[in-house]
Curated annotation (Swiss-Prot):
The gene is MT-ATP8. It comes from Bos taurus. It is a single-pass membrane protein. PANTHER family: ATP SYNTHASE PROTEIN 8. One of its GO terms (cellular component) is mitochondrial membrane. Keywords: Acetylation, ATP synthesis, CF(0), Formylation, Hydrogen ion transport, Ion transport, Membrane, Mitochondrion, Transmembrane, Transmembrane helix, Transport. It comes from the Eukaryota. Belongs to the ATPase protein 8 family. This is ATP synthase F(0) complex subunit 8.
Length: 66
């Protein structure tokens, strides 16, 4: 059974990392970032729900007299 030649693996792995790094740098450099991000104020509208307008009384079963 022949031996596996691993002498070129280091070169291949290093070249792969270099290529991936270059591709990633090119993709990030073409991305448009916001220069000055600011929070936009949002208005919270108060909506009345039916259970807020009605008076309700909740009875727990354990509090009822026997």
């Amino acid at each position: 059974m022949p031996q596996l030649d691993t002498s070129t693996w280091l070169t291949m792995i290093l070249s792969m990392f270099l290529t991936l790094f270059i591709i990633f740098q090119l993709k990030v450099s073409k991305h448009n970032f916001y220069h000055n991000p600011e929070l936009t104020p949002t208005k919270m509208l108060k909506q009345n729900t039916p259970w807020e307008t009605k008076w309700t009384k909740i009875y727990l079963p354990l509090l009822l007299p026997l």
